[in-house]
């Protein structure tokens, strides 16, 4: 009996050790974040955007898919939010969101992204609405002389085993994600993301968003726990002009796609 118990304990210990295989490391000692990452199967299904329904009487509300921002908007932003509908969403025209490709909150919507890491750069590729980010990790400063862009200018640094990505210099033409929702931002947007590979199969991602022209306080994005996907290459799911036109047409037929 004692022998059987000892064998069982050893078996469980071995299984636990196997399940918690440490994160791989680069030659320089930093964790290797490379791999295809997704939310796994244990996350709740994200809410579906509302279908056409009668508008309530009174002032136009902030559409449900932008409610996440309501506690953060300043008064000017709240006024603007009430005038915008789905048809104003630039992601329906195949434009990327401000977080770039590995959007912390977009994983709630099933985003799949691939990370490729070298000693000087971390490259992040998105499967949906394909785009990419090239993040230098060699200590260089922001390229303030570059024109603003939808992905901004990102630089990375290591804080222990955590990759910290600081992104500034955004244009105000695209929108940002908020826990699966989308809304506008200004050119003062500043995002700090943190990527920590806990073990071989698990990575935590979190971020803090600041935008003094739109938000009254920083928005701290809920931490996401991602899993290493059982495949090593993403697909290229193009957002084409035909798909974009269909999305815009559908948005224009809902009440939330119409300005009051």
Predicted regions and their residues:
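Positively charged n-region of N-terminal signal peptides that target proteins for export
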Residues: 1-5
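Short, linear, compositionally biased motifs with a strong N-terminal bias
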Residues: 10-11
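PEST-like low-complexity, intrinsically disordered acidic/proline/serine-rich tracts
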Residues: 18-260
């Amino acid at each position: 009996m004692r022998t059987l118990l000892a064998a069982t304990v050893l078996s469980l210990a071995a299984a636990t050790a196997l399940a918690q295989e440490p994160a791989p490391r680069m030659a320089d000692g930093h964790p290797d974040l490379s791999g295809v990452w997704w939310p796994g199967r244990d996350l709740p299904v994200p809410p579906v955007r509302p279908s056409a329904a009668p508008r309530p009487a009174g002032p136009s509300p902030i559409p449900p898919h932008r409610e996440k921002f309501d506690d953060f908007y300043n008064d000017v932003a709240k006024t603007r939010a009430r005038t915008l509908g789905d048809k104003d969403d630039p992601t329906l025209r195949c434009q990327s969101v401000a977080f770039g490709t590995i959007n912390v909150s977009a994983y709630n919507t099933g985003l799949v992204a691939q990370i490729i890491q070298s000693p000087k750069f971390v490259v992040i590729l998105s499967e949906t609405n394909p785009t990419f980010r090239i993040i230098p990790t060699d200590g260089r400063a922001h390229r303030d002389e570059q024109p603003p862009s939808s992905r901004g200018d990102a630089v990375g640094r290591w804080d222990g085993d955590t990759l910290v990505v600081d992104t500034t210099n955004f244009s105000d033409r695209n929108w940002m994600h908020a826990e699966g929702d989308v809304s506008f931002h200004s050119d003062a947007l500043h995002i700090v993301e943190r990527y920590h590979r806990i073990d071989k199969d698990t990575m935590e991602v979190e971020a803090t968003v600041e935008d003094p022209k739109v938000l009254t306080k920083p928005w701290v994005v809920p931490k996401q726990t991602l899993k290493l996907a059982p495949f090593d290459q993403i697909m290229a799911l193009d957002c084409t002009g035909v798909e974009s036109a269909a999305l815009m047409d559908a948005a224009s037929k809902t009440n939330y796609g119409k300005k009051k």
